[in-house]
């Protein structure tokens, strides 16, 4: 979370450092293990740990192939090895991410809304998101929207057409 002048919000950064401390060594090991699993299965993957301001946040893995189903196979093996305790999984197309449970847009939005209400009182909140995981913060909003071809829109369309 950033302050209005674009600088790091130290209070929020401190909260995140506390929430993520147990994952700081685990995330690089998880990234390496996921890439090795892909290699063992015969797939070309790339991956990294997303880090900002000296704090490791989550693991991202993508494939270099033509079939997004590859990541589902890699995920199944990572899960079978019990490597994701305390983590959320975000899988969407060529994107497989492992996020510690203390890292969630919802928590940041809750904090931002709390601060905003202190300064400006209660006011309407609009939310915009494109993935199913965005629903975690979007339900804090009075109204929300999603792009027509997003993962979220496709999921809603599938539910309507069932």
Language model region names:
Residues 1-39:
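Active-site phosphate-binding/coordination module
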Residues 18-22, 86-88, 116-119, 153-156:
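Short, surface-exposed, polar/charged, turn-prone segments marking secondary-structure boundaries
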Residues 30-126, 132-140:
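Conserved acidic, metal-coordinating active-site core of Asp-based
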Residues 119, 139-162:
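Asp-based, Mg2+/Mn2+-dependent phosphohydrolase catalytic module
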Residues 129-133, 148-151:
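Short, polar loop motifs at secondary-structure junctions
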């Amino acid at each position: 979370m950033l302050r209005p002048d674009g600088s790091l919000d130290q209070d929020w950064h401190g909260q995140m450092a506390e929430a993520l401390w147990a994952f700081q060594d685990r995330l690089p090991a998880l990234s390496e293990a996921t890439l090795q699993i892909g290699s063992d299965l015969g797939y070309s993957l790339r991956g990294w740990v997303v880090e900002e301001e000296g704090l490791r946040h989550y693991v991202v893995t993508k494939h270099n192939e033509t079939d997004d189903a590859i990541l589902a196979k890699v995920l199944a093996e990572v899960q079978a090895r019990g490597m994701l305790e305390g983590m959320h999984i975000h899988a969407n197309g060529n994107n497989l991410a492992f996020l510690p449970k203390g890292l969630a847009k919802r928590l940041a939005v809750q904090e931002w809304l709390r601060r905003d209400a202190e300064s400006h009182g209660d006011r309407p909140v609009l939310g915009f998101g494109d993935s199913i995981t965005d629903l975690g913060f979007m339900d804090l909003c009075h109204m929300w929207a999603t792009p027509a071809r997003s993962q979220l829109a496709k999921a809603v369309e599938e539910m309507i057409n069932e």
